[in-house]
Amino acid sequence: MEIQSEKLALMAGDGNADAYRALLERHYDLMYRVAYRTLGQQADAEDLVQEICTSLPKKLSSFKGDSKFESWLYRVVVNAGRDLMRKRGAQARAADGWGDVEVMQREAADETTENTRWLAHAMSRLSPELRETVALVLGEEMTHKAAGQALGLSEGSVSWRMSEVKKELRQMAMDEEMLQ
């Protein structure tokens, strides 16, 4: 029987190295995906996840088990990504890699690939706040409520951000005469 992540987190917060190892094995890929979609650069995402892995044992003592561990972890990753972007002043290049995974998966279909490339470029032009919201709602398929919990926002704020994303993407497409 598998131990729930919340229980593992509480155990790891109390210094249990085996619980910490199990948490990393279970959630490393999730941390990387969120970091990559938030930062857009493979090297930045790898560095960020390594930093998080180093600081996570200390941070786990603040996890109280009131929410799902995954929601708490999303917030840790998003906040660490924000800190890194502020520290590096890299907001202009923060999403260069958005959509690379999707582009690679659809390389066989030229028309789809062209549309995906356009979307990746358009995503890179969104504000970091909108990108991180899209990364959770579309990339991680979270509900607006769950994304709000992870970002420290209300469900309504997440819905508003997603509405803004649609509006900005539509405007970009119209500006580039992609919509007829």
Residue ranges and their predicted role:
Residues 1-30, 37, 121, 171, ...:
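N-terminal module of bacterial RNA polymerase sigma factors
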Residues 2-5, 83, 91-116:
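Internal acidic/polar
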Residues 11, 93-96, 121, 149-152, ...:
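C-terminal edge and immediately downstream basic/flexible tail or linker adjoining helix-turn-helix-like DNA-binding
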Residues 13-14, 37-40, 51-68, 87-89:
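Sigma70-family region 2
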Residues 26-29, 37-40, 135-143:
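Short helix-capping/turn signature of helix-turn-helix
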Residues 58-65, 75-96, 112, 164:
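Arg/Lys-rich amphipathic alpha helix in sigma70-family domain 2
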Residues 64, 86-89, 126, 131, ...:
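Short, Lys/Arg-enriched C-terminal cap helix and immediately downstream tail that follows
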Residues 78, 82, 130, 139, ...:
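DNA-recognition helix of helix-turn-helix
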